[in-house]
UniProtKB/Swiss-Prot annotation:
Pfam family, one: Pkinase
Name under which the protein is recorded: Probable serine/threonine-protein kinase pkgA
Family of this protein: Belongs to the protein kinase superfamily. AGC Ser/Thr protein kinase family.
Composition-biased stretches (Acidic residues): 506-517
Amino acid sequence: MYNSQQQNIIKINKQDTDGRLQLFIVDAKRTLRNSSIELESSQIYIDVTKRLIDIASLFCKQEEIQYESFAEELLSILNSTQFKILGKCRELVIKLLTIIAKYARVNQLLGIESKDRSPSSSINKNNGFDQLYDFELNRIDENNNNNNNNNNNNNNNNNKNKTISPTHQTIQATIPSPKLQPFLDHDDKDDKEIIDIVSNKDKDQLNGVDDVDLSNTSGISCKEIFEKNPINFQKSHYRCLSYSPKLLEQQLQQKLVNQQIKLKNGKPSPIKRPSPPLPPPQQQQKEQQKEQKEQQKEQQKEQQKEQQKEQEQKQQEPQKYVKFEIQKSPPSNLLPPLPISSSNISNEISKQQQQQQQQQQQQQQQQQQQQQQQQQQQQQQIAQPPPPQSITSPQTISANNNILTTPLSSQPTQSLETPSTIKPPLLSRRVSDIIYSKNETNLNIKEPIHSKDIIPTPLETNVGGGGGEITKKVVGSEENLLSSSSEEETLSTSEEHDEYTTSTSGEDEEEDEDDDNIYNTNHYEISERKLKNKRPFKKTHVHHSLSANSPLSRKPYESPVFLLDPRLNDLKTSSDEYILKRPLVRSKSFSPNKEEEQIKKEPYRKLARSFSEIPSVKLIEDHNDDSQMAMCRICEEPIHSSLLEDHSKICAMANEEDMKAMNVDDHLRAVAKILLTRSNDIPHEKRKMIIELREIALFAVENGIKENLKMIHIMNDIIKNFDPKDDNRELAIKIQSLISDKVNALKRADDVINSSPRIFRTNSPRILKSPREEELSQTPLGGRLRSDSDPVHQTQIEYKPKGVPTISDFEFIKPITKGGYGKVFLAKKIRTGDIYAIKRLKKSDMIKKNQLDHVKVERNILAYTSNPFVVKMYYSFQTKEYYYLVMEYLQGGDCFSLLQMLGSMDENMAKMIIAETVLALEYLHSHGIVHRDVKPDNLLIDKKGHIKLTDFGLSKVGLLDRQTVVPPSYFSPTLSGKNNQSSSSSSVSNIGGSNTIGSNISSTNNNNNNNNTTGATMVGGHVINTETPIPSNTAIPAKKEKKLLSLAQSKSLFSASSSPSIPSLNLLNSDKPISPMMMGVKGFIPPPPINQQPISNIPTTTTTTTTTTTGQQSQQQSQQQQQTTPPLPPHNIHRKLSCVGTPDYLAPEILLGIGHGASADWFSLGVILYEFLCGVSPFNGSSVQETFQNILQRNISWPEDMSPEARDLIDKLLALDPRQRLGFNGAEEIKSHPFFKSINWKTILTQEPYFKPKIENLQDTSYFDPRKEIYKVSDDFAESCKPFVQNQNQNKESSTILTTSPPSTSSTTATATATTSNLDSITINQNTNANFDDFLYVNFQSLLELNKNYLAEAKPFNSNHRRRNST
């Protein structure tokens, strides 16, 4: 039975051996794979390597095996005369022999015998190693072995005494057989070099010891044997470690400093041990040791002078790298060796602990003496390596392994504290490993460190002992080397690989244990890099130039493979500033060359993360598989599905910057138009400068980075020539600023494309599809033609950038529904096949109804927002007559259609819909957006049953403000001195209000705009008020102080003070009593009777130009209104007119014009919830007046079957005072209401909705059928959109265009159509072009989400290749 200390040694020995064997298997497999490519490789090398792998695998799996049989088999391979094993294969054989020898020797020292091993085999277990030793070191004179036997035994006892690192406990064991020493001393060095640097001490060990009685010898640590050959760790092996290599290096450097300090501190007091009775042979050894000590002291005095001289010479020799073999303690021979026993070990540990305390006390007293002797002793140690007699110098080490005492000091030196113990990984890297480090890195040592016990330096060794010294030169031949010259590859690979992979990430440094599937090109790169550098390794005072050519690789010198990669030619940047920034992806090597690709034939990477894993473009084209190709929605080019994710990111970045440059071009064209107008009104002297500015603006539109950089410098001189008071100077500054913005955008797009791998590159419309220079030179300066997307500015250059949407890119399938200002069509993108919903609005109607600002507001909100409960917009563009919004198509219809089919909803279904609507409104309010038109019609349902909010035409984000707040817009038509905008005077808000509900209610359709009709205002398609007739060609200028702000600027301008005006309705003239809740509203004054109220106090309609003040006229108007207004149908019939604004959902503050904010949306939400549960609006009336009166007086009928929670929520949402309304302080008030107790707000998007539409295909519009029946929308696309088809084919609009009027007013359709045809088309076109110059937009983030959705829905791409850092 073994004690706990011996069991720990056995466990550590097995772990260390298994780790070394695993690394050996990986190295052998890599060699086997690479040797199959070499032309000079023979089959015997492959067979031997495979056998070595099998032996290592078998040895690693078993705990106790007959390792002697493996040693004999490996020795037979080395001694084979038929097959001469050389090069890397020979190195592997010796490496495996070394591992097995270390494992076997530790077991021998512990007295371990295998269960299956007989006594006879135990006696002859070193025969195989003896044969190898005789075979490799036949030049060493063996005649002197018997003469120096006793002397060398003493030397071995002095040099073998180590501690166990996991437990810091000392185990004394027997001396190993000397013929096993070549494998135990084998340190991955060139064998010839090993023989050359053997010292006298080592030679005495090899020649003077043969078969030693293991039971009678001790003094050597087992750990010293199985750790003597350190592993040369590489970066690729760090996966096996659980701690940082940098931390390990710091630990080793600290131990180096401690060891050097201890050696400088003089001779400590020896540790006294119990001396048991010694056998006669050991007593003789002790006497011999005393004699040798006396001789050593005399020789040291004689050699001091020589050491000082040699020190000066060797300090001048340059040493770039110093190789250290770190040992935890120097050897000691103060006391005679003790046999292994548990009692001796325990006694030794207790004595050592006591000695340690004494040493710590003595250390404090001797610190001053140590500082004085430190410099002198350091120079002596560096100057001269230890003489042969130095091996008998008495040294001892304490059991704590932190106190080291030497003969030079009588006091111990306490070492620095080591970091906390880390759990050993699969392969333990110990402190005896070899490290290559520069001298500058060790800041604690002023001079290079040369330890006498690390690497012996004499090239001449003394054979013999005592007084007789026989000098013999150690010479080795190439045939008798322990390993071939290719062992240099192991050293160089370790160092070069460390240097080369310093900048790579941790994931790329890992390697799989199963190297058969590794797509590795580092072997070729490292070998070429090694041949290029050819730097010799310097190991202390021995300088040997290692051969660079290995037997298995005799290729001529070539440049590194990654520098020959042709894809490097494509990696160009516009300036040196961006050289260090590329590539975007993390890469440590480029892809292999064409020859390696033909050999590998590996499939593509699933997601390539570095150049070494990116297949070439040619390989993609050769293996083009339509089933694995996907269409990128951004650049609309096919790309492999495995690369779509990374490509989409780069594509979106490049195209977004390119689109910014295109928008700058639009502004430059607008400025050029302004300059053209101004040039007609100024004197001839200044006209030349204005024309020059216009030419520069148009020149900047058509050219790229280099030309525009020149224009910026030219503009500096032009601006200086302008008078500071000249208005044109501001335009010149604006032109220069726009050109600079364009150059910056193009640079960013160019950098994104050029710094990305070619396989990921995008087809940016401007970078890769720019017009040719020849066409530009032959064409006069002017704006380019952007097809239908920009028909205003036309030149002879018919250039349509790729990626810019136009109407010809879509195939219209059928109409879906129509609203107050346009229609919605189902369309398909021809190139990608995606289905969209396209909202088409006629420009002339937008101008006449003063809705241009609302259209842009809706576009900006859709472009700005990104939320799962808000409809996404992908494109916005225009033609000569129409404006288009391309949005996502939601097949589930809207809540209005759903309510029409169900009549009313279940409370749980309504709760889910309202909850998702609350999240949508919360998102909008957090971004300063008030929807102001929340109703069931605008709540769309997707294919999964979730809600999305749409129709932001009436929304308010503070986008309208006075001109003093915003800088002037240089492309506004008002700067030309003329105002050709034709529009009706919209309702004016109190403070900077927007024309929203008021204009919506007061806007009349084309049916009512004829020359003979009066200024009637339509609400729900019915005449509300009549005024003085207005000619159709009368143009009332809009207010100049109103200006459209960008969405980013408008975020900070959100206010709740604006409200639209209300048409002149007798809202408060009713016989019903005023609600007592209205009396509590602050600032509320009961209105006087209608016959006493001045008519001037009633807001007028937007189409009136004169008002009357007499009571008779007001009474006549009321009578005329009653005569012309037919009775309203029931609620489910007049609800179909909500497209032009249904008053059922208007908040009281909007009707009263006292200012409104986000609370108006919560009021509408309460109305919707009531309508979902009851099937009818809470304020429904037989007329619009009655509906408004019900809202202001809060006349609500509560059904009996409504739950108390629902009633309480509706009651609080319908509060008349906005400050008392639920949600005034935020959406959390609503979300915390008991009605939503069962709602999980965090996971609501993943919950199963109560209504999930059943869709036959992506083009299914069956859930919009109720709206089609109400609006009488025909499914026949040719019939319902005949004028539109003619516009596509003939580029002109028919005069009989389909109007947006409700079907109930069909009697006036013909008249309205005739009126539209008589409009001044020239004026309308001018105004349209002026207000839609900058309308083109592509939402690249939404398109990026389409690519991600495609990857999520499509089947994942399965590759046979496993990435290097995959687990």
